[in-house]
């Protein structure tokens, strides 16, 4: 199990201040707006939009904010920005490979923010293609355990193309090929298994174990990157063991 995945599911516990929470809300709202613009404003006919709305609701984003974002994206209301997805590549402390996914209406600002965060936190930018080949696009669903066992989840999604089910502590994670994400979503719904989120992700083909010192430096860099309003996601090839995670949590 990739330690970064578990860290990501518990990260909201560490986002205690209002500024962090506000940034998280802004990223979720942006996802809704882009999904509505790309696939239309009707969630029942646009699974990506429905998933973005579900994730926002699970994160306690107010319904009014969600609805306004949907309308901006679909063109029902004015004010939608011209969002552009940009993927930056680089290396973090101790050579950890990183992909930084931005959703921005200002490419120059995004580039400056990412470069500044990398330079100040032991990272460096890399040429396009020099890091991305280490990662594969995957579909990833995250769900509360509830009464379900790992076998229950696997049984529900295996025929839909799921490759693995990972135990993240309080939650399960289902990983599939990116082309199978719709089938896995449908399988979860058919089995009446509620999920927090289901979206496309990047997973490292080979992960590199990290000790507590390296992990702490990389997580600090990720925090600095995610402080930028333009950064939506950060992916790494770092694997953090349960022992190292426990050591970091105790600090």
Curated annotation (Swiss-Prot):
Protein name: Probable transcriptional regulatory protein jk1057
Keywords: Cytoplasm, DNA-binding, Transcription, Transcription regulation
Transcription listed as a keyword: yes
Similarity remark: Belongs to the TACO1 family.
GO biological process terms on file: regulation of DNA-templated transcription
A Pfam family recorded for this sequence: TACO1_YebC_N
GO annotations of cellular component type: cytosol
Cell compartment(s), UniProt: Cytoplasm
Matching PANTHER family: TRANSCRIPTIONAL REGULATORY PROTEIN YEBC-RELATED, TRANSLATIONAL ACTIVATOR OF CYTOCHROME C OXIDASE 1
Residue ranges, annotated region (Disordered): 1-22
GO MF annotations, alphabetized: DNA binding
Organism whose genome encodes this protein: Corynebacterium jeikeium (strain K411)
Main location class: cytoplasm
Domain of life: Bacteria
């Amino acid at each position: 199990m990739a330690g970064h995945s578990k860290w990501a599911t518990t990260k909201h516990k560490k986002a205690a201040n209002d500024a962090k929470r506000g940034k998280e809300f802004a990223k979720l709202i942006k996802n809704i707006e882009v999904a509505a613009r790309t696939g239309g404003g009707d969630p029942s006919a646009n699974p990506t939009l429905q998933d973005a709305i579900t994730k926002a609701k699970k994160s306690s984003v107010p319904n009014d904010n969600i609805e306004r974002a949907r309308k901006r994206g679909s063109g029902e209301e004015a004010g939608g920005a011209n969002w552009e997805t940009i993927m930056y590549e680089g290396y973090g402390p101790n050579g950890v490979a990183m992909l930084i996914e931005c959703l921005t209406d200002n490419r120059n600002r995004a580039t400056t923010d990412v470069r500044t965060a990398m330079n100040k936190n032991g990272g460096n930018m890399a040429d396009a293609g020099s890091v991305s080949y280490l990662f594969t696009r995957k579909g990833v669903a995250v769900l509360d355990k509830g009464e379900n066992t790992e076998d229950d989840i696997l049984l529900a999604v295996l025929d839909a193309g799921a490759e693995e089910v990972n135990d993240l502590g309080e939650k399960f994670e289902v990983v599939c090929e990116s082309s199978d994400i719709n089938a896995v979503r449908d399988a979860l719904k058919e089995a009446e298994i509620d999920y927090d989120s289901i979206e496309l992700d990047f997973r490292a083909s080979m992960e590199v174990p990290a000790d507590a010192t390296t992990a702490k430096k990389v997580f600090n860099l990720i925090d600095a990157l995610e402080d930028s309003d333009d950064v939506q996601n950060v992916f790494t090839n770092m694997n953090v063991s349960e022992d190292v995670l426990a050591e970091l949590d105790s600090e």
